[in-house]
Design a protein with these regions (language model features):
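Conserved phosphate-binding/catalytic loops in two-lobed NTP-binding clefts
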Residues: 107-133, 141, 147-148
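Short flexible coil/turn linkers enriched for glycine and charged/polar residues
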Residues: 30, 45, 87-89, 111-113
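Interdomain boundary/hinge elements
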Residues: 11-15, 87, 121-123, 145-147
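Residue-level signature of catalytic and energy-coupling elements of molecular machines
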Residues: 73, 95, 131
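Phosphate/ATP-binding catalytic cores across multiple sugar-kinase/actin-like superfamilies
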Residues: 61-89, 134-137
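Phosphate-binding glycine-rich/basic clefts of nucleotide- and phosphate-handling proteins
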Residues: 5-63, 78
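Glycine-rich phosphate-binding loops at beta-strand->alpha-helix junctions
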Residues: 25, 85-109
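Short, small-residue-biased leader/transition segments that mark boundaries at the very start
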Residues: 1-8, 70
Length: 150
Protein backbone atom coordinates (compact mmCIF):
# COMPACT_ATOMS: atom_id res chain seq x y z
CA UNK A 1 0.00 0.00 0.00
CA UNK A 2 1.53 3.24 -1.19
CA UNK A 3 0.24 5.40 1.68
CA UNK A 4 1.82 3.11 4.28
CA UNK A 5 5.11 2.99 2.37
CA UNK A 6 5.35 6.78 2.31
CA UNK A 7 4.36 7.07 5.96
CA UNK A 8 6.94 4.55 7.12
CA UNK A 9 9.52 7.26 6.54
CA UNK A 10 7.60 9.48 9.02
CA UNK A 11 7.85 12.35 6.54
CA UNK A 12 4.06 12.71 6.46
CA UNK A 13 1.08 11.04 8.08
CA UNK A 14 -0.98 8.33 6.41
CA UNK A 15 -3.99 10.62 5.99
CA UNK A 16 -1.82 13.24 4.25
CA UNK A 17 -0.35 10.57 1.96
CA UNK A 18 -3.84 9.42 1.02
CA UNK A 19 -4.94 13.02 0.34
CA UNK A 20 -1.93 13.60 -1.92
CA UNK A 21 -2.64 10.39 -3.80
CA UNK A 22 -6.26 11.43 -4.37
CA UNK A 23 -5.37 15.04 -5.30
CA UNK A 24 -2.50 14.58 -7.75
CA UNK A 25 -1.89 10.84 -8.08
CA UNK A 26 -2.49 9.09 -11.39
CA UNK A 27 -1.76 5.82 -13.15
CA UNK A 28 -0.50 7.59 -16.27
CA UNK A 29 0.38 11.15 -17.35
CA UNK A 30 -2.69 13.38 -17.40
CA UNK A 31 -3.32 16.68 -19.18
CA UNK A 32 -4.28 18.33 -15.88
CA UNK A 33 -1.27 17.15 -13.82
CA UNK A 34 -0.45 19.52 -10.98
CA UNK A 35 1.77 19.84 -7.93
CA UNK A 36 0.94 19.66 -4.24
CA UNK A 37 2.52 21.46 -1.32
CA UNK A 38 3.03 19.05 1.54
CA UNK A 39 3.91 19.75 5.14
CA UNK A 40 5.73 17.06 7.05
CA UNK A 41 8.85 16.41 9.05
CA UNK A 42 12.41 16.59 7.73
CA UNK A 43 13.98 13.16 8.21
CA UNK A 44 17.45 14.58 8.86
CA UNK A 45 16.69 17.44 11.24
CA UNK A 46 13.36 16.26 12.62
CA UNK A 47 11.98 19.76 12.08
CA UNK A 48 8.75 20.63 10.26
CA UNK A 49 9.28 21.10 6.54
CA UNK A 50 7.26 22.03 3.46
CA UNK A 51 8.01 20.41 0.10
CA UNK A 52 6.37 20.53 -3.31
CA UNK A 53 5.58 17.16 -4.85
CA UNK A 54 4.86 16.84 -8.56
CA UNK A 55 2.28 14.57 -10.12
CA UNK A 56 5.14 12.77 -11.90
CA UNK A 57 6.83 12.01 -8.55
CA UNK A 58 3.61 10.63 -7.10
CA UNK A 59 2.93 8.62 -10.27
CA UNK A 60 6.42 7.10 -10.05
CA UNK A 61 5.86 6.23 -6.38
CA UNK A 62 2.53 4.59 -7.25
CA UNK A 63 3.80 2.73 -10.30
CA UNK A 64 4.80 -0.50 -8.53
CA UNK A 65 1.35 -0.83 -6.96
CA UNK A 66 -0.43 0.02 -10.23
CA UNK A 67 1.76 -2.42 -12.18
CA UNK A 68 1.00 -5.20 -9.68
CA UNK A 69 -2.74 -4.51 -10.04
CA UNK A 70 -2.51 -4.65 -13.83
CA UNK A 71 -0.38 -7.81 -13.75
CA UNK A 72 -2.99 -9.46 -11.51
CA UNK A 73 -5.75 -8.60 -13.98
CA UNK A 74 -3.65 -9.97 -16.85
CA UNK A 75 -3.09 -13.22 -14.93
CA UNK A 76 -6.85 -13.59 -14.42
CA UNK A 77 -7.53 -12.86 -18.08
CA UNK A 78 -4.97 -15.48 -19.14
CA UNK A 79 -6.96 -18.25 -17.44
CA UNK A 80 -10.44 -16.94 -18.27
CA UNK A 81 -12.65 -19.45 -20.12
CA UNK A 82 -13.33 -18.44 -23.77
CA UNK A 83 -17.05 -17.78 -23.24
CA UNK A 84 -16.31 -15.41 -20.36
CA UNK A 85 -13.53 -13.75 -22.36
CA UNK A 86 -16.09 -13.00 -25.08
CA UNK A 87 -18.34 -11.41 -22.47
CA UNK A 88 -15.45 -9.32 -21.14
CA UNK A 89 -14.65 -8.03 -24.62
CA UNK A 90 -18.30 -7.03 -25.04
CA UNK A 91 -19.14 -5.67 -21.60
CA UNK A 92 -15.68 -4.85 -20.28
CA UNK A 93 -14.14 -4.77 -16.84
CA UNK A 94 -15.71 -2.66 -14.09
CA UNK A 95 -13.33 -1.16 -11.55
CA UNK A 96 -14.55 -1.00 -7.95
CA UNK A 97 -13.10 0.09 -4.61
CA UNK A 98 -11.06 3.09 -3.58
CA UNK A 99 -8.14 2.24 -5.85
CA UNK A 100 -10.47 2.49 -8.84
CA UNK A 101 -10.66 6.25 -8.21
CA UNK A 102 -6.99 6.74 -9.12
CA UNK A 103 -7.01 9.06 -12.12
CA UNK A 104 -6.02 7.33 -15.35
CA UNK A 105 -6.33 3.79 -14.00
CA UNK A 106 -9.22 2.75 -16.28
CA UNK A 107 -7.39 4.12 -19.33
CA UNK A 108 -4.07 2.48 -18.46
CA UNK A 109 -5.69 -0.87 -17.66
CA UNK A 110 -7.61 -0.78 -20.93
CA UNK A 111 -4.44 0.12 -22.85
CA UNK A 112 -2.46 -2.73 -21.28
CA UNK A 113 -5.16 -5.43 -21.48
CA UNK A 114 -6.95 -4.39 -24.70
CA UNK A 115 -10.23 -5.01 -22.83
CA UNK A 116 -12.77 -2.19 -22.32
CA UNK A 117 -12.54 -0.82 -18.77
CA UNK A 118 -14.89 1.49 -16.94
CA UNK A 119 -15.37 2.82 -13.46
CA UNK A 120 -18.34 1.43 -11.56
CA UNK A 121 -21.04 4.07 -10.97
CA UNK A 122 -20.58 3.56 -7.20
CA UNK A 123 -16.99 2.32 -6.86
CA UNK A 124 -16.78 2.73 -3.08
CA UNK A 125 -20.05 0.91 -2.44
CA UNK A 126 -20.04 -1.64 -5.29
CA UNK A 127 -18.50 -4.56 -3.39
CA UNK A 128 -20.85 -4.34 -0.43
CA UNK A 129 -23.85 -3.79 -2.73
CA UNK A 130 -22.85 -6.87 -4.74
CA UNK A 131 -22.41 -8.95 -1.59
CA UNK A 132 -25.84 -7.80 -0.40
CA UNK A 133 -27.35 -8.77 -3.75
CA UNK A 134 -25.79 -12.25 -3.45
CA UNK A 135 -27.19 -12.69 0.05
CA UNK A 136 -30.67 -11.51 -0.98
CA UNK A 137 -30.66 -13.80 -4.02
CA UNK A 138 -28.70 -16.72 -2.61
CA UNK A 139 -31.09 -19.43 -3.80
CA UNK A 140 -31.03 -18.19 -7.38
CA UNK A 141 -27.25 -17.66 -7.38
CA UNK A 142 -26.05 -20.56 -5.26
CA UNK A 143 -24.84 -22.52 -8.29
CA UNK A 144 -22.23 -19.79 -8.84
CA UNK A 145 -20.64 -20.24 -5.41
CA UNK A 146 -17.85 -22.68 -4.65
CA UNK A 147 -18.22 -25.19 -1.85
CA UNK A 148 -15.50 -24.16 0.62
CA UNK A 149 -15.48 -27.66 2.09
CA UNK A 150 -13.88 -29.14 -1.05
Amino acid sequence: DWSSDVCSSDLIGERTAEEIKMQIGSAMPMTNDRDAEVRGRDLVTGLPKTVVLTAAEIREALDDVVTRMIDSVKECLAVTPPELAQDLLTRGIYLVGGGALLRGLPERLQYETKVPVQLSPQPLEAVVLGAGHCIENYQALRGMFMDARR
